[in-house]
Amino acid sequence: MSQSADETPIEQVAPTPENIRQDAKVNFPVFLGSSVGILAIALWALISPTSAAEVLGVAVGAISKWFGWFYIALAAIILVFVFFLGFSRYGETRLGPPNSRPEFSTFSWASMLFAAGIGTDILFFSVAGPVSQYLHPPVGKGETVQAAREATVWTLFHYGITGWGMYALMGMALGYFAYRRKKPLSVRSALYPIFGDKLNGPLGHTVDGAAILGTIFGVATTLGIGVVQLNVGLEILFGIDQGIPAQVGLVILAVAMATASATTGIHKGIRFLSQLNVVLALFLAAWVFITGRTDFLLNAIVMNIGDFVWSFPRRALETFAYNDVSAWMSAWTLFFWAWWVAWASFVGMFLARISRGRTLREFVVGTMLIPFSYVLMWVAIFGNAAIDLIRSGDNSFAEATLKTPEMGFYLLLQQCPAAVFIMGLATFVGLLFYVTSADSGALIMANLSSFLPTVRSDAPGWLRIFWAGVTGLLTIGMLIVGGIPALQNATIIMGCLLYTSDA
């Protein structure tokens, strides 16, 4: 792919992070405070899983009852504000000096942008989400034509532009203050207009520590869902039993791969894995699309787009005040919004890190449209294919997916030609999704717990290895507590704390 004059790679115009990493120093107040807190939670989950599960359940119930409206309203407000910044006169402002240009080619930027914010979970929810909404919608009767139309759109909504608006707001704020105001590329810089130089002390350390807590729970949730999903693939392909031993092994393998990638920096490992991930994932989706009922899927995709656009304003502010669907809200909309918030510090900082030289308008359009275009394609293909399979009379697929959601994706792939090859490819793609999330998360958490001499600097390699390992330990702890539901509950709690503090 050729590059335009304003897309010269950073390697040609500036020192790489690897050349200046030796100047980075550990921020011990942030490092010790966040690591001790996370390790304490992980050990609590490992030592007393029953107690941890009970506390998580009670806390989530209270949050759903008293703060659900706040989640919904603030998410909508953030989205409107982001579009205003991007398409107003402020949209011409660059994330960098006025004469700066993008550091990465458009393809590299788009690949990293989408891979950092989308994880293995999209394999899980692209089938489990639509199937669940079709069989048991929040309101109305399931297994109807209306339920089929609503099912995929609900999943698109939960993975849609509302969440990316949270990422974009954080990324714009961090990028602006780092590149235009010469502040550190850390979460504390986003609060500089409010607190000023007070952020240079304990207050700033607390903000960055909270960002690390949110990041690690968000990433651990994605990784936990990922290893459960991958365990299914390994059982089908190689007969490896599902369970904690296999999942622990997958966590260790993925953390090792993520560590190797993260220690090479953005310009090498992370960029390469992101690009490879995009290509293989697109091939996988294209295979299902071409070998399946292509005519039906084309019609369904167009219909999904129309339904999504038409119903978006209603869904964005939907609290179901007149319906008793608190359990559904906790499991779906509130969980997803908390999940996006938990990831916002990490992804926003990462987006700012790779977006130097782009205008706010480019940034908003890119972050809102590029990942969602992929999500739309992926969810529409796999979600509609799954619903079509159920409506064609395959009740066993419906029952299995509802009972064991992580099975749904692979059961759908078993219907495709060359099923063994495609399931093997899907497992590898899932592993790459896992690694690109984990390596980016380890890099950002290491940077948040360091004093960096420049915005292009990265933390010492050992610190990235530490955070990759702690993320794996927390993932294992939450899986032992209760698997995916425990991870979801922990994310809702951390998301609520971050939501409230950010507001």
Report the location of each language-model feature.
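Conserved small/polar residues in nucleotide/adenosyl-binding loops
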Residues: 499-503
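Membrane-water interface regions at transmembrane-helix termini and the short interhelical loops
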Residues: 18-23, 49-63, 82-103, 153-157, ...
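Membrane-helix boundary/coupling elements in multi-pass transport proteins
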Residues: 180-185, 214-231, 345-364, 420-449
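Extracellular/periplasmic helix-exit of transmembrane alpha-helices
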Residues: 125-137, 288-311, 319, 372-404
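Helix-loop-helix module between adjacent transmembrane segments
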Residues: 22-25, 29, 33-46, 79-82, ...
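Flexible loop linkers connecting adjacent transmembrane helices
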Residues: 15-21, 54-60, 88-106, 131-153, ...
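Membrane-interface helix-loop-helix modules in multi-pass membrane proteins
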Residues: 78, 82-85, 95-185, 365, ...
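Loop-to-transmembrane helix boundary motifs in multi-pass membrane proteins
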Residues: 23-38, 196-205, 240-259, 263, ...
